[in-house]
């Protein structure tokens, strides 16, 4: 999968842009605040229905405009696919695929699997469990056809159960929610556990190349005691949940812990090493998807040079080239991305929201 064309209208500081994209590397070079990250964010939004720097649609729509519009053409395995997304200041979204409306954002995500690497991405390693659950859920979404529906139903049931906890006095009054919740929770936990086991070898191999000085280990924690039956646990902890007014255990509390030499990575690794580990996780996940399904991710890398010395930048560049995937990279100067340049690459100069193709030597 690769985007061959990207049209942007009234997104961030970009009034209008029509970009013919390279199947390999697409470099976005410009000063801070020029709009290069906005291009990355437009690509991300086209595949996710939301931006990665803001969850509010109004903040990514250009000043005084009613909506943003994004359109892309995807070079699929068998044919070219047209996709589009628009969103108004009121939050109304419209998803279009091959000229027809009424589609879901999840369909865009299936068509455009992406891995995002940003300076804020350290939260995958030093943030709360929700960021690592999202890592596992990305893999389950792209590998298990029933995952998204089950995950959506789980969120709905947990919300309903938590609301009911504020109103009920006996467990029998909440049993109906649990009878639906329990099989969903167990199924999602099984999918996550299977995915974490399956991808462990890929992560270990990639980390050995990026951080050979550490012995890294990975463990999936499902969100409740592994020796306990989830249904019995919910009933046993009813009074505690009622006092808290939320469900304290379950797949919504799962985690994927990473240790280096037996120590949590966030307590041992430098920022440069954490960035390499984050890149290793994203690369391993993308390569696992390719091996399982034949589909390639798009890799979006914002501020490529931050936290990485020349040797580490070259290592990351070589691994990205080996994926043969489409890559979008932002940098302050062209010199920072010279190790990535090649015959399948294209360089764009971004200044004050204007984007121009730059010739490569």
UniProtKB/Swiss-Prot annotation:
PROSITE patterns, per database record: RECF_1, RECF_2
**Broad class of the protein's primary localization:** cytoplasm
Which residues does ATP bind? Answer: 30-37
Keyword DNA-binding listed: yes
One GO term describing the cellular component: cytoplasm
Please provide the record's keywords in A-Z order.
Answer: ATP-binding, Cytoplasm, DNA damage, DNA repair, DNA replication, DNA-binding, Nucleotide-binding, SOS response
Q: Which GO terms describe its molecular function?
A: ATP binding; single-stranded DNA binding
Recorded hits in SUPFAM superfamilies, A to Z, give: P-loop containing nucleoside triphosphate hydrolases (SSF52540)
For this protein, the record's Gene3D superfamilies field holds: P-loop containing nucleotide triphosphate hydrolases, RecF/RecN/SMC, N-terminal domain
Instruction: Report the locations given in the UniProt record.
Output: Cytoplasm
Q: Which domain of life is it from?
A: Bacteria
| Keyword DNA damage appears in the UniProt entry | yes
Xref: Pfam families:
SMC_N
Q: Member of which family?
A: Belongs to the RecF family.
Function noted in UniProt: The RecF protein is involved in DNA metabolism; it is required for DNA replication and normal SOS inducibility. RecF binds preferentially to single-stranded, linear DNA. It also seems to bind ATP.
Protein name stated in the entry: DNA replication and repair protein RecF
Organism, scientific name: Serratia proteamaculans (strain 568)
